[in-house]
Amino acid sequence: MIKKTLLIITVGLLAICAANGQTKETPIEPDGTYMFEKRDTCDLFLDVYNPAKGSKTTLNGKKKPTVLFMFGGGFIRGTRDDAGYNKWFRQLTENGYRVISIDYRLGLKGSNKVGIAQVNVLDKAIHMAVEDLFSATRFIVDNADVLGVDPANIVISGSSAGAITVMQAEYEVCNRTSWTQTLPEGFRYAGVMSFAGAILSRKGEVKYGLTPAPTMMLHGTADNLVNYKQIKFFNLGFFGGGKLVKRFDKFGYNFNMYHFLGYGHEIAGSMDTTLDLQLKFLETNVIEGKKRIVEAWIDDPNVYKGTGVQSRKELYGN
């Protein structure tokens, strides 16, 4: 049964108060750290956080997925173990989910001008991160028994640059592009969670050759860093959640879309304050495999707006 919800949520979210949108607290230590790739410029590692002791790791007899996370930072900064993610990692593990947080190369580090006009530079940075995500995925699949991961039950998630990467990655997977050669043949992710993400296309409107995995998107309608709607020039386009959801709706894909009215890029760091939305998506759309379609407009005066970096000028200096 398909259920589509159209609503405006005015209460129920906590304030987003940390500089990067995440509330910092006591560090959570990974249960294991592994090098998954050796590049010319650096070694790439991933941290594994197992479900908390005593937590429920199944739902109605079905195993909960592993959440594979990519940090934010505009492709110029950020780390897989940033303290700002502690609370969210702990929330997920206490709810029975395994979390894997990965490194990726920062393809825009050192760039002094970044935007759609510098599309080749941006494209390279995005696909460099996608390449590292696919390498991490291959490592996880190849070592699934050791890591305790079901290869068919991996949900990719990201914040800001990480969200762009996971959305782009699923786009590449669904279109079987050359970037996916690292992945096992026929591999599919079980779901996607994007906190202020987008997709870069050189072929006009975003088109999926295969039906995308269940996808959850959260995006501020006033986001000026990762544009909420789109930036387009002929066939070149950078499409945010506000535009992508129209494609998902038109073609009947499985999605949850949360539009944060008047919010900027702080939604990229809203993971620990939107946990209930995530758990509902993971439990219903991913684990139970139901096509629960939700499109919601959220406006909560108690959620502080304007936290963290809000523009390209602030982040890149141009």
Descriptions of predicted regions:
Residues R80-I102, K109:
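Short amphipathic alpha-helix adjacent to the substrate-entry channel of hydrolases
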Residues D249-N318:
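C-terminal catalytic histidine-bearing segment of alpha/beta-hydrolase fold enzymes
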Residues T180-F251:
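The feature captures the conserved acid-bearing segment of alpha/beta-hydrolase catalytic domains
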Residues N120-D145, G240:
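Alpha/beta-hydrolase active-site loop
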Residues G61-G74:
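Short beta-strand element of the alpha/beta-hydrolase
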Residues Q22-K62:
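N-terminal cap/lid segment of alpha/beta-hydrolase-fold proteins
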Residues R138-T211:
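Primarily recognizes the serine-hydrolase "nucleophile elbow" in alpha/beta-hydrolase
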Residues M1-E25:
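Bacterial Sec-dependent N-terminal signal peptides
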